[in-house]
């Protein structure tokens, strides 16, 4: 299958606007932070193969993430913690992560921030939401790839701390294996206690000694 670049919608490319694409990763999992990314692509340096991160293999996502970081005009990745998710709710925490990613790039005066979905963070610049933006707008697609790969790396790191939960396989999503691990071991301090399967569960001490020593070093 031929690779393709997702074309910008015509109206978004007008008026000399600089497009900042924004997307998040990790709203559905029971554990771990939620991530967001913001990307400004170079129109003169087309990155082939961009698509919704969920439609790409892990190998392809990693390859594209490296290209985006090397060839984009600007990019940023941010997150909101499990504590923020439980305190604010997952939607507001996702918007907070998006806001952090965009603000860290200090958008210029003619910036147009395009956000995947139908909710946008509060920003001091022009913002539009785009339903299915990760499949329609190259900048949003690139942001979805950076957010997803960054979160996956974090969940692999957390797997070292809590290997019995299998975060290396499901990345915190509510798979059958993950739910069974919660039933057997309880939850950890990186589980989202406001999410239904985790509500009322006891906190486990199932953390590896090597990870504790690493954190304390």
UniProtKB/Swiss-Prot annotation:
Entries under Pfam families matching the protein: RNase_HII
The record's free-text note on cofactor binding: Manganese or magnesium. Binds 1 divalent metal ion per monomer in the absence of substrate. May bind a second metal ion after substrate binding.
PROSITE patterns: RNASE_H_2 (PS51975)
Entry keyword annotation includes Phosphoprotein: no
Entry keywords, A to Z: Cytoplasm, Endonuclease, Hydrolase, Manganese, Metal-binding, Nuclease
InterPro entries: RNase_HII (IPR022898), RNase_HII/HIII (IPR001352), RNase_HII/HIII_dom (IPR024567), RNaseH-like_sf (IPR012337), RNaseH_sf (IPR036397)
Gene Ontology CC terms: cytoplasm; ribonuclease H2 complex
Main location: cytoplasm
Keyword Calcium: no
Enzyme nomenclature, EC number: 3.1.26.4
Required co-factors: Mn(2+); Mg(2+)
EC category: hydrolase
Catalytic activity field: Endonucleolytic cleavage to 5'-phosphomonoester
Domain (RNase H type-2): residue spans on this chain: 17-207
Subcellular location field: Cytoplasm
Entry's Gene Ontology molecular function annotations: manganese ion binding; RNA binding; RNA-DNA hybrid ribonuclease activity
Binding locations of a divalent metal cation: 23-24, 116
Any single biological process term in GO: DNA replication, removal of RNA primer
PANTHER family: RIBONUCLEASE H2 SUBUNIT A, RIBONUCLEASE HII
Protein family per UniProt: Belongs to the RNase HII family.
Xref: HAMAP family: RNase_HII_B
Job of this protein: Endonuclease that specifically degrades the RNA of RNA-DNA hybrids.
NCBIfam families listed in its UniProt record: PRK00015.1-3 (NF000595), PRK00015.1-4 (NF000596)
Protein's UniProt name: Ribonuclease HII
């Amino acid at each position: 299958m031929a690779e393709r670049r997702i074309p910008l919608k015509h109206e978004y490319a007008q008026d000399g606007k600089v497009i900042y694409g924004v997307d998040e990763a990790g709203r559905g999992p029971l554990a771990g932070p939620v991530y967001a990314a913001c990307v400004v692509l170079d129109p003169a340096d087309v990155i082939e193969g961009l698509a919704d991160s969920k439609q790409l293999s892990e190998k392809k996502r990693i390859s594209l993430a490296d290209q985006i970081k090397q060839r984009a005009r600007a990019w940023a990745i941010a997150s909101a913690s499990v504590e923020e998710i439980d305190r604010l709710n997952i939607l507001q925490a996702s918007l907070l992560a998006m806001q952090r990613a965009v603000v860290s790039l200090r958008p210029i005066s003619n910036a147009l921030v395009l956000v995947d979905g139908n909710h946008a963070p509060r920003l001091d610049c022009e913002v539009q939401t785009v339903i299915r933006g990760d499949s329609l707008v190259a900048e949003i697609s690139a942001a979805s790839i950076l957010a997803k790969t960054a979160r996956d790396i974090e969940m692999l790191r957390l797997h070292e701390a809590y290997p019995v939960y299998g975060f290396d396989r499901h990345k915190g999503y509510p798979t059958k294996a993950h739910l069974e691990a919660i039933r057997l071991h309880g939850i950890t301090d990186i589980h989202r206690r406001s999410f239904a399967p985790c509500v009322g569960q006891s906190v486990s001490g199932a953390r590896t000694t090597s990870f504790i020593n690493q954190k304390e070093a």
